[in-house]
Swiss-Prot record:
Belongs to the SHMT family. This is Serine hydroxymethyltransferase. Its EC number is 2.1.2.1. The keyword Amino-acid biosynthesis applies. Its cofactor is pyridoxal 5'-phosphate. It is found in: Cytoplasm. Catalyzes the reversible interconversion of serine and glycine with tetrahydrofolate (THF) serving as the one-carbon carrier. This reaction serves as the major source of one-carbon groups required for the biosynthesis of purines, thymidylate, methionine, and other important biomolecules. Also exhibits THF-independent aldolase activity toward beta-hydroxyamino acids, producing glycine and aldehydes, via a retro-aldol mechanism. PROSITE patterns: SHMT (PS00096). GO terms for cellular component: cytosol. The modification N6-(pyridoxal phosphate)lysine is found at residue 220. Pathway: One-carbon metabolism; tetrahydrofolate interconversion; Amino-acid biosynthesis; glycine biosynthesis; glycine from L-serine: step 1/1.
Amino acid sequence: MCKEIYDLIAKELYRQQSTIELIASENFTSKAVMLAQGSILTNKYAEGYINKRYYGGCEFIDEVESMAIDRVKKLFKCNYANVQPHSGSQANQAVFLALLKPGDTILAMDLNSGGHLTHGAKPNISGKFFNAVHYCVNKDSYLIDYNEVEMLAQQHKPKLIIVGYSAYSRKINFATFKEIADKVGAYLLADIAHIAGLVATEYHSSPIPYAHIVTSTTHKTLRGPRGGLILSNDESISKKINSAVFPGMQGGPLMHVIAAKAIAFSEALMPQYKEYINQVMLNAKVLAKLLQDRGYNILTGGTDNHMLLVDLRGKNITGQEAEYLLDAAGITCNKQVMPFDTTSPTITSGIRLGTPACTTRGFKENEFITVGKYIADILDNIAIIKSAKKNEGITITEIEKSLNSVITRTKHHVQELCNCFPIYTN
């Protein structure tokens, strides 16, 4: 490996080791997953499917893909699986290609309410090729408004209804979505990219009995390599999906990644993985309560999964400011648009916090109480400084200078805590 790349990898390893990772979509894979992903399987082209390849020399590749498929079907208790999508976005695009025609109507959650770009957002290909209609959360509870979903479905008669989100902290009633889809003759797609680990361990109800098709990423709560996944119990739809993935969307599958997926699925079938997901959820609840007790507005009043959404509109703090200054203190999170947010997506009015990565490191409730205090201390000080300068205006850089002692002290405490929980030993 060249020195330049080696040095950058070393720096990134140090960053991951010495900071608190609270981005809900990130996690730390096992060494076994990384070993497979860095294996000689990357050398092999394998266009096509098991026993139906367009290249020779795929006998062992077929076994790898077969193993991944068998394991994920067991994990999610389904009949059909495609493990070839390179990402969750491409998994969703394959579903659109398989089931829709350009101009068809799709019904999905609005981006500001917690939906995903690939669910018909205007900048995304899904919003350019299809007529996207969006439902929102309830303005008072910030929960899914099932009545609005049904009303819009009856009004617009979508070909596809999408359920599953990137910023929603409560449980989803897949059965209700199935009833709505059936009333209007729509396909139902469940995108469980964020909650796949909870579904696999039965801490969240499974969409498999209700949705025509289920997509997911293989990282996030599944703790595997970055990649995509498509599941179904419908044989005819699964055949359409296979054709949409290859040759419709992709050429050769990434066999080194599929091997890593197989390992991650095997790890998720182990009893300790269920214990891990339970701890992820406990940690999220503890963090949400701590921040609530410190006066911060947690959307929906709490969480049922691995994430929480902190609405900072009442504190006169932007998501951009919170993300930047928490990062300066060694706490990594992401700014997040809030429901009915009027600020730019590059500014936002809140932050999203997730517990999977730090739980993988071994953090439990006590550690997350400590983390919550660090976060609240930083945010409290931002609010104080901005309040004192409210008539003059103040930049993030100026806030950072004023917070220098608090940031320095917090960063030191963060590093001490992280040193007690190494990501990888040896």
